[in-house]
Amino acid sequence: MPSFDIVSKTDFAEIDNALQNVTREISQRYDFKGAHCTVERKDQELTINADDDLKLKQMHELLQGHLARRNVEAGVLDYKEPEKAAGQSVRQKVAIRDGLDKELAKRIVKDIKGSGLKVQVAIQGDELRVSGKKRDDLQAVIQFVKGLKIEQPLQYENFRD
């Protein structure tokens, strides 16, 4: 019985490389001279420190640009509300999404079952296993899921016949 897995994996090594490139660019750019702007990663969370909202916005653009160069989709970042730090400075936490959370997995399963395609979907931890009688059904599921409005990037792997 053909099957495949729907997963959401994040390459943390590539995120670290992008953060190092952002830090290097911040230290070299003229508009960041004298500014105390940093980006740090601790487990699955980034902390962006900037002098003001304008610098924070520029750091968002830098971070997204460097992630795109490293083939990491910007959808893996979940920006929280910026908060005031000491003086004029601003701090923002950014969660890094890795794996499918339960609500998103349930929503995808519900949408696939509601589509009328003849496949079975099972939640296995932080991934989904989709199996069906025909390979064409599975390819239709992949196209259907790609058409859903999901912020988190998804990968399709272990396609077996």
From Swiss-Prot:
Name of the molecule in the record: Nucleotide-binding protein Plav_2177
Database matches in InterPro entries: DUF520, UPF0234-like_C, UPF0234_N, YajQ-like_sf
Function of the molecule: Nucleotide-binding protein.
TM spans (from-to): none
Native organism taxonomy: Bacteria, Pseudomonadati, Pseudomonadota, Alphaproteobacteria, Hyphomicrobiales
Alphabetical list of Pfam families matching this protein: DUF520
Keyword presence, ATP-binding: no
Keywords on record: Nucleotide-binding
GO cellular component: cytosol
Family: Belongs to the YajQ family.
GO molecular function: nucleotide binding
Native organism: Parvibaculum lavamentivorans (strain DS-1 / DSM 13023 / NCIMB 13966)
CDD domains registered for this protein in UniProt: YajQ_like
